[in-house]
Amino acid sequence: MATILAHITIRAGKEPEFEAIAQTLHPASHATEPHLRAYGYWRGSEPRTYYTLLAFDSFLDFINHQTSDHHEIASPQLGGCIEAMRLEWVDPIQGASTLPPTRSQEAPADADELTAKYAQRFAAQIADWWPARP
């Protein structure tokens, strides 16, 4: 499982463009990614702040999302809108969430170059204080 909370700050004046991209990515992701558990966007209380919650059956399913055609097409557009972004790996509390624990995975040995690159760039960060993974 992989669950991420993205903290996003948008460049001033780019909010409408960012929201339009999100409105394209959301349905495309839900329609084409069978291992997607949760994916949504929220406006924060501070101007230009947004949050995205992403949850997948596995870390490699998250990487498949990142390397999907619709995400790769949107990435340059997103880059023009995003001023800053921090990915926070979060761990669902068992018994208080329907999502399983966040786990890290390595890319398969036969992974294509983009998948291997993204698996390293976005490697899951498992906090020391989280319960041990079975």
Regions found by a protein language model. Name each.
Residues 9-20:
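Short, surface-exposed ligand-recognition loops at beta-strand->loop->(often short) alpha-helix junctions
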Residues 13, 47, 73:
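Short alpha-helical
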Residues 24-37, 55-90, 115, 119-134:
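An amphipathic, aromatic/His-enriched active-site/gating alpha helix that lines ligand/cofactor pockets
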Residues 2-9, 38-68, 88-89, 100-108:
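Short, well-ordered beta-strand segments in beta-rich or mixed alpha/beta enzyme
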Residues 93-98:
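A short acidic, often aromatic-flanked loop/helix-cap motif at beta-alpha or helix-coil junctions
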Residues 108-111, 125:
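Surface-exposed beta-loop interaction hotspot
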